[in-house]
Curated annotation (Swiss-Prot):
Motif range ('KMSKS' region): 629-633
Assigned protein family: Belongs to the class-I aminoacyl-tRNA synthetase family.
Organism, as annotated: Chelativorans sp. (strain BNC1)
Pfam families: Anticodon_1, tRNA-synt_1, tRNA-synt_1_2, tRNA-synt_1g
Reaction it catalyzes: tRNA(Leu) + L-leucine + ATP = L-leucyl-tRNA(Leu) + AMP + diphosphate
UniProt-recorded name of the protein: Leucine--tRNA ligase
Compartment(s) of residence: Cytoplasm
One GO BP: leucyl-tRNA aminoacylation
InterPro entries associated with the record: aa-tRNA-synth_I_CS, aa-tRNA-synth_Ia, Leu-tRNA-ligase, Leu_tRNA-synth_edit, M/V/L/I-tRNA-synth_anticd-bd, Methionyl/Leucyl_tRNA_Synth, Rossmann-like_a/b/a_fold, tRNAsynth_Ia_anticodon-bd
Residue stretches in coiled coil: none
Motif segment ('HIGH' region): 43-53
Origin organism lineage: Bacteria, Pseudomonadati, Pseudomonadota, Alphaproteobacteria, Hyphomicrobiales
Enzyme Commission number(s) from the entry: 6.1.1.4
UniProt entry keywords in alphabetical sequence: Aminoacyl-tRNA synthetase, ATP-binding, Cytoplasm, Ligase, Nucleotide-binding, Protein biosynthesis
Originating gene: leuS
One Gene Ontology term of the molecular function aspect: ATP binding
Length: 871
C-alpha cells in the first residue's frame, strides 16, 4: 500500500509547538522522582549555530529524552556564555553596542536551536551578561574575598600599547598584538587573582575519583596542576662577582641528583637578581627589555628561540666552594615557577643541552643507562633523560639516580649557609593562581572600591549589583570604564570619602565556572538555593569539546570547592560524568585567487576517486582541501538551517550521530545527509503501511510461532539500544535500529492478511521501534505514534521493558571434548536439559566414530558451557 512521504517541514514545527504547549521539558525542583542532570557546554552567542553545535546538543538531547522515558526527573537547561571580546570587537567594527549585538545573536541562535527539536528547559534560560546572573557572581566574588580566596597583586601581562589593553596569550602573534600589530610589552599591573593554588593538592588527588571522565582529560589536568617533589637549594654567590647586598641565589630543582652535571644557572628576566645586575649593565638591560616583548605564556616561551645573557655573576657549587658556575639571564625561565631560577644540567635536559651548545658551556654526563660503561659513555647528539646509574658525580657514582636524589637532599639539608640549611625538600605545583582581571568593558564588573584612606573595600552586598553603564563609547583604545565621566566615581562604603570603582571586569572563564549550579535555581535571590543545588549536583552527564579539558573544567572544579567553603553547597566535584565529543569536519574549497568558498558555492563532479570542484558563480575549478574542523575563516561550514530546510532536523540529528563513534570526528557530507533522510522515509513507510493492520490491535509479544520472528528482534533491539545509549554509543544504537527495520520489513509485508497474534506482535514491535527512534528523531517518532493511533505524546511516555526470555538466542553452540580434547561442536536449543544434551552429543558423527560402537564411560555436561565425552 502506497503512503505519502514524510514531510518534516510541516511535521517538525507542529510537534515542537505541542511539546511547548504541554511544557513537557520544564523541570520541577520539587518532583519526587530520582534526578538526572544532563548538560552540554553552553555556547557563545556568536550569531549562528553551526552543525558542530547540532552534534553536541543532539548527544545531550538523546540522553535527556532517554532518561526522561526511564522515569527520571531530568534537568536539561540552556543558556549563553555571553560576555567577552568578540562583542567589543563588533562594537568597534560595526558601531553597535555590545549588549545589542549579544542579545540579537542570542535571539537568532535560540530560534535555530528550537528548530532542532531539543528537549530543553527554556524556562531556566539565562545569559551570563544578564544583570541577574552577574549580580550573583559579584556576591560570590565578595564571599570568596572574605574567605581569603581572592587577592590583589602585581603580575606580568601582555600589554598592547596601541589598544591600551591587556591581551590574552592567544592574542599575541609573533610578539605583536593580533589586531593592532604593535609590539607587545610585558608590564607589571595590579591584578585580581583567585587562589586556586590553595586547592592544588585536593584538585590533583581528587582526579583519581573521576571514574566517568576520559583518561586523557584526567591526564591533562594532572599535568596542568603539575605536582613535583624537589629540592630548594641556596647557592652562595662568589663575593667578587656579587652585586651589593646580594649573597645567594635560591634554585628549585626536581633533579638534585644531577647537581654535578650543572654547568650554568639561569634566572628569569624579571628576577630581582637580573634587575640588580642590569643596573650597571646597559647591554643586559637591553636584553631584558627584549624579553619583555615576548608572550607571557609557557607555550610562547617554549617555542621562542632560547636566548641568554651572561651576567658576570658566578655562584659556588654547594659541594665544592672552589667550583664556580656562571649565572645567565634566560628568556625561557619563568619567574612564576619555583623560585624563578634554575640550574642547567645539559647532559640530562634537552633545553639545557641546546643552551649549553649555543653558549659553549660544558656538557658533563652524570647519568647513564644501566649496564653502560662509565669509561666510554658520552653525551654527543642528544642528552640522556631517563633513569640510570650515576657517573662523574663523586660520592654519588654507582648509585641509581633515585638513590642519588636522596643522598644529595640529606647532605644539603645538614649543610648550612648563613646559619640556615643549604637545602630543603619542597613540593611545587605548575598550577598558578588564576588571574581574573580584564581591562575590558564587556564583562562582569569586579565589585571592589579603591579608597585612598581605607584601601580596597568590597561593595556592600545590599548595594549590588554593580551594573555596567550603557552610555560608553569605543572611539578610543582602552577600557571605556576607565574614562566614564560618572560610573567609576563613588563614595567609600567604609569612611564615606570620595573613592573609585574597580574598572577591571572578570575573565569570562569565571562566568562559565558556576553556571551549571545556577541552572538548578536560576531565579533565586542568592547565587544558588543550597538544598536544591545539593540535590541536582554533580551534573550526571556533561558534554563538550576536548579544548576545554583543562581551564574550564579545572576552574569549575575550583569554583565548586570555593562555593562549598563559603557555604553555598555541600560537594566538591561539579561533573560526575564527562564526555568529550569529536568535531564535525568538512573539506575546504579555495579559488585560484586565494578566496575560500563555502560548500554551497561549489559544485562537485566526478566519482569518489576523481572528484573535482567548480565555483558555481564562475564555473572555474577550485582546489579541494583536506578535512578540517568547520571554521568561519575557511568557510567550510554548513548551516543547520540549510539542512533543516532540505531534509528536516531529524535527518541532521540522525546523521550527526550515525556516521562514527561520538568521541571521534565526523565528516559532514551531503551524500551522508541524503542517506540519513532515505532512512527517515523508509522507517516512515514501514510504520505507516503497517498502521491500518495494527491500528485497533492490543500490543502483545509472541514467544513462539511465526509471530516470534517479529517480537524477538524487537525486544533484542530494545535491550541493546538502551544499553548503547547508557554507554553513549549512539552510532551503535543507530546501527541496531537499522537492523530492526530490516528484520521487520519481511514479516510486516503481509500484515493485512495476518492472524491476530501476528498483528498483536507487530503492534508491539512498532511501538518499540517508535520509542527507539524517539530520542534520536523525536518529530518522526511523534508523527509515527499518531499514525498508529497512539495516545498522548511519545516524549511524555515511558521507555518499554524488554522481555528477558525474548532476548535470549534460542540456540547455543557447545564445544564437545572427547577425553579432554576438543573434537567439534554441538548446536542445540538453549533450554535443552542434560538428558537432551547427552542424547544429541552421542548422535554426532565424530563422537560415534571415536566410540567405535562402544558406550561412553561417562558424559559430563557443564550446563550451557561445554560437554566432555569420556570414552
Amino acid at each position: 500500500m502506497a503512503t505519502e512521504r514524510y514531510n518534516p517541514r510541516t511535521s517538525e514545527p507542529r510537534w515542537q509547538k505541542a511539546w511547548e504547549e504541554a511544557r513537557l521539558f520544564e523541570t520541577k525542583n520539587d518532583d519526587g522522582r530520582p534526578t538526572y542532570y544532563v548538560l552540554e557546554m553552553f555556547p557563545y552567542p556568536s550569531g549562528r549555530i553551526h552543525i558542530g553545535h547540532t552534534r553536541n546538543y543532539t548527544m545531550g538531547d538523546v540522553v535527556a529524552r532517554y532518561k526522561r522515558a526511564k522515569g527520571y526527573n531530568v534537568l536539561h537547561p540552556m543558556g549563553w556564555d555571553a560576555f567577552g571580546m568578540p562583542a567589543e570587537n563588533a562594537a568597534i567594527q560595526n558601531k553597535i553596542h555590545p549588549k545589542e549585538w549579544t542579545y540579537d545573536n542570542i535571539a537568532t541562535m535560540r530560534s535555530q536551536l528550537k528548530m532542532m527539536g531539543l528537549s530543553l528547559d527554556w524556562a531556566r534560560e539565562f545569559a551570563t551578561c544578564d544583570v541577574d546572573y552577574y549580580h550573583r557572581q559579584q556576591m560570590l566574588f565578595i564571599d570568596f574575598y572574605k574567605k581569603g580566596l581572592v587577592r590583589r597583586k602585581t603580575s606580568k601581562v601582555n600589554w598592547d600599547p596601541v589598544e591600551q589593553t591587556v591581551l590574552a596569550n592567544e592574542q599575541v602573534i609573533d610578539g605583536r598584538g593580533w589586531r593592532s600589530g604593535a609590539l607587545v610589552e610585558q608590564r607589571e599591573l595590579a591584578q585580581w587573582f583567585f587562589k586556586i593554588t590553595d586547592y592544588a593538592e585536593d584538585l590533583l588527588s581528587a582526579i583519581d575519583g573521576l571514574d566517568d571522565w576520559p583518561e586523557k582529560v584526567r591526564l591533562m589536568q594532572r599535568n596542568w596542576i603539575g605536582r613535583s617533589e624537589g629540592l630548594s637549594i641556596r647557592w652562595a654567590l662568589a663575593e667578587d662577582t656579587a652585586p651589593a647586598g646580594v649573597g645567594e641565589l635560591e634554585v628549585y630543582t626536581t633533579r638534585p641528583d644531577t647537581i654535578f652535571g650543572a654547568s650554568f644557572l639561569a634566572v628569569a628576566p624579571d628576577h630581582p637578581l637580573a634587575r640588580k645586575a642590569a643596573e650597571g649593565n646597559p647591554a643586559l638591560a637591553t636584553f631584558i627589555e627584549e624579553c619583555r616583548h615576548m608572550g607571557t605564556s609557557v607555550a610562547a616561551l617554549e617555542t621562542a628561540e632560547k636566548k641568554g645573557f651572561d651576567t658576570g655573576i658566578r655562584v659556588k657549587h654547594p659541594f665544592d666552594a672552589e667550583w664556580t658556575l656562571p649565572v645567565y639571564v634566560a628568556n625561557f625561565v619563568l619567574m612564576e615557577y619555583g623560585t624563578g631560577a634554575i640550574f642547567g644540567c645539559p647532559s640530562g635536559d634537552q633545553r639545557d643541552f641546546d643552551f649549553a651548545n649555543k653558549y659553549g658551556l660544558p656538557v658533563i654526563p652524570v647519568v647513564m643507562p644501566e649496564g653502560a660503561d662509565a669509561a666510554t659513555f658520552e653525551i654527543t647528539a642528544e642528552p640522556y633523560v631517563d633513569d640510570g646509574v650515576m657517573l662523574n658525580s663523586r660520592f654519588l657514582d654507582g648509585m641509581s639516580n633515585k638513590e642519588a636524589f636522596e643522598e644529595v637532599a640529606s647532605r644539603l639539608e645538614k649543610e648550612t649557609l648563613d646559619g640556615k640549611p643549604v637545602a630543603k625538600r619542597k613540593v611545587n605545583f605548575r598550577l598558578r593562581d588564576w588571574g581574573v582581571s580584564r581591562q575590558r568593558y564587556w564583562g562582569c564588573p569586579i565589585p571592589m572600591i579603591h579608597c585612598d584612606t581605607c584601601g580596597v573595600v568590597p561593595v556592600p552586598k545590599e548595594e549590588l549589583p554593580v551594573k555596567l553603564p550603557d552610555d560608553v563609547d569605543f572611539d578610543r583604545p582602552g577600557n571605556p570604564l576607565d574614562r566614564h565621566p560618572t560610573w567609576r566615581h563613588v563614595k567609600c562604603p567604609q569612611c564615606g570619602a570620595d573613592a573609585r570603582r574597580e574598572t577591571d571586569t572578570m575573565d569570562t572563564f569565571v562566568d562559565s565556572s558556576w553556571y551549571f549550579a545556577r541552572f538548578t535555581s536560576p531565579h533565586a535571590d542568592s547565587p544558588v538555593e543550597k538544598d536544591v543545588v545539593n540535590r541536582w549536583l554533580p551534573v550526571d552527564q556533561y558534554i563538550g569539546g576536548i579544548e576545554h579539558a583543562i581551564l574550564h573544567l579545572l576552574y569549575s572544579r575550583f569554583f565548586t570547592r570555593a562555593m562549598r567553603d563559603t557555604g553555598h553547597l555541600d560537594l566538591a566535584e561539579p561533573f560526575k560524568g564527562l564526555f568529550t565529543q569529536g568535531m564535525v569536519v568538512h573539506e575546504t574549497y579555495r579559488a585560484e585567487d586565494g578566496r575560500w568558498l563555502t560548500p554551497a558555492e561549489v559544485r562537485i563532479e566526478g566519482s569518489a576517486g576523481e572528484r573535482r570542484a567548480f565555483e558555481i558563480a564562475t564555473g572555474k575549478e577550485v582546489a579541494i582541501g583536506p578535512l578540517e574542523k568547520m571554521s568561519k575563516s575557511k568557510k567550510n561550514t554548513v548551516s543547520p538551517e540549510d539542512i533543516t530546510e532540505s531534509f528536516g532536523a531529524d535527518t541532521a540529528r540522525w546523521f550527526m550521530l550515525s556516521d562514527s563513534p561520538p568521541e571521534r570526528d565526523v565528516e559532514w557530507t551531503d551524500d551522508g545527509a541524503a542517506g540519513a533522510h532515505r532512512f527517515v522515509q523508509r522507517a516512515w513507510r514501514l510504520i505507516t503501511e503497517a498502521a491500518p493492520a495494527i491500528g485497533d490491535i492490543t500490543p502483545k509479544a509472541a514467544r513462539d510461532g511465526d509471530a516470534a520472528a517479529i517480537s524477538k528482534p524487537a525486544h533484542k533491539a530494545l535491550k541493546a539500544v538502551g544499553e548503547d545509549i547508557e554507554r553513549l554509543a549512539f552510532n551503535r544504537a543507530i546501527a541496531r535500529i537499522h537492523e530492526l527495520v530490516n528484520d521487520l520489513q519481511g514479516p510486516f509485508a503481509g500484515l493485512d492478511k495476518a492472524d491476530e497474534e501476528t498483528r498483536a506482535a507487530a503492534r508491539e514491535a512498532t511501538e518499540i521501534l517508535i520509542h527507539l527512534i524517539a530520542p534520536f528523531m523525536p518529530h518522526l517518532a511523534e508523527e509515527c505514534w499518531a499514525a498508529i493511533g497512539g495516545k498522548d505524546l511519545v516524549a511524555a511516555s515511558r521507555w518499554p521493558d524488554f522481555d528477558p526470555e525474548l532476548v535470549l538466542d534460542n540456540l547455543i553452540v557447545l564445544p564437545v571434548q572427547i577425553n579432554g580434547k576438543k573434537r567439534g561442536d554441538l548446536t542445540i536449543a538453549r533450554e535443552a536439559d542434560q538428558a537432551a544434551v547427552e542424547k544429541a552429543v552421542l548422535e554426532l558423527d565424530f563422537v560415534q566414530k571415536a566410540l567405535n560402537g562402544a558406550p561412553p564411560r561417562k558424559v559430563i555436561v557443564v550446563s550451557q558451557r561445554i560437554v566432555n565425552v569420556v570414552a
